[in-house]
Amino acid sequence: MPKSVSPNGRGTIWAWPSTMATKNDQWCRDNTIRPVLSMQAHSAPLGITFFNYSNSSTSADDCPDDGGFPKSMNGNAFIAFHGSWNRNPPTGYKVVRVPMGDNGNPTVDEAIDFFCHHDKSGSGAKWPNGFRPVDVVFDKCNRLLITSDGTGS
């Protein structure tokens, strides 16, 4: 079953797996809210943060001019995909960006790969050093920090 991002609120159904195989496609179309964004099954989205531009008044020594994200990316979502352990080819093992509109919904149909590994030898998304993103956060200088439990980073 694909992962998804859906609006939450009155009348939404968050019952998987209790409704699995008990409802047909038509029932689902008539009684549920479609996700606004889908993600590959087994990609394991663990951490999500929304970029909140910081116009920090710190000195240039603290925040160099060439390292942070621009204000134009304010509100974008960044999601850490921990990655699959049980599928071939592997999926996940990356950080994606989801541009968000003023209404709080994604402005794209699919998340945009932001930090990922593309291996030409056939091992897929896995990083050779074991890197597996867990969470993402921005520092006061608008730089994205990524944690990994595969490398201790």
Residue ranges and their predicted role:
Residues M1-W127, F131, C141, S153:
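Beta-propeller domain segments
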